Amino acid sequence: MRPSQRQPDQLRTVRITRNFTRHAEGSVLIEMGDTRVLCTASVEENVPPFLRGKGQGWVTAEYGMLPRATHTRSSREAAKGKQTGRTQEIQRLIGRALRSVIDLKALGERQITLDCDVLQADGGTRCASITGAWVALYEACDKLVQAGKLPANPVRDHVAAISVGIYKGAPVLDLDYPEDSDCDTDMNVVMTGAGGIVEIQGTAEGEPFTREQMSVLVDLATLGVRHLVAAQQSALAA
């Protein structure tokens, strides 16, 4: 039995709240159980130097955790003067995931930065960040269309992410912190709404996992992503 009493294929309760803050072009609070992440999208009418004059835009991301997002306080990375390797890895993952579903040429020479700030962490923060940031990105692009700066929204498909793993010998969906810290296998799967795989990050924390187990986990993640895409659609329709 899982610590949360959930079924093996059961997501935590997902809530996506749009327009959570006032100033950003896209603003979303995503809650997956007790994990809460604020995702904002900021539009700049310029691109990084390596893209100037090339007729395309850019989407990038930054990720961070509030000092008391976890059980004990962690110092702000700004106070230390550098980001951890984990932070850099996660924000690159978020950026890659979002760029996989947007037409950068259709975006034009502008940059959209997604800031994902973890308010409370209970496992799956990078996955929640991707799922929430997609809604913020779509919202920001929609505002560009409404302002007459784009003829159509350049976001071509949904993208969402979910964790899966092997916990006490059984495959489970959407690991919370107690499961994440005690699982045999931990895997993050990023997929599009059409079912395309963007990225899989899988690690054996204990016993190595088999190819058959990996297939089961990817199937489980596919089920989870379908539910998350439905949650994204509901948020946009609200």
UniProtKB/Swiss-Prot annotation:
A single MF term (Gene Ontology): tRNA nucleotidyltransferase activity
Enzyme class at the top of the EC tree: transferase
Keyword Transferase: yes
GO biological process: rRNA catabolic process; rRNA processing; tRNA processing
Tagged with keyword Transferase: yes
Family matches, as CDD domains: RNase_PH_bact
Gene3D superfamilies noted in UniProt: GHMP Kinase, N-terminal domain (3.30.230.70)
InterPro entries the UniProt entry points to: ExoRNase_PH_dom1 (IPR001247), ExoRNase_PH_dom2 (IPR015847), ExoRNase_PH_dom2_sf (IPR036345), PNPase/RNase_PH_dom_sf (IPR027408), Ribosomal_Su5_D2-typ_SF (IPR020568), RNase_PH (IPR050080), RNase_PH_bac-type (IPR002381), RNase_PH_CS (IPR018336)
EC number(s) stated in the UniProt entry for this protein: 2.7.7.56
Binding site for phosphate: 86, 124-126
Keywords linked to the UniProt accession: Nucleotidyltransferase, RNA-binding, rRNA processing, Transferase, tRNA processing, tRNA-binding
Catalytic reaction list: tRNA(n+1) + phosphate = tRNA(n) + a ribonucleoside 5'-diphosphate
Subunit note: Homohexameric ring arranged as a trimer of dimers.
Family: Belongs to the RNase PH family.
Function of the molecule: Phosphorolytic 3'-5' exoribonuclease that plays an important role in tRNA 3'-end maturation. Removes nucleotide residues following the 3'-CCA terminus of tRNAs; can also add nucleotides to the ends of RNA molecules by using nucleoside diphosphates as substrates, but this may not be physiologically important. Probably plays a role in initiation of 16S rRNA degradation (leading to ribosome degradation) during starvation.
NCBIfam families from the UniProt entry: RNasePH
Name this protein carries in UniProt: Ribonuclease PH
Species: Dechloromonas aromatica (strain RCB)
Gene: rph
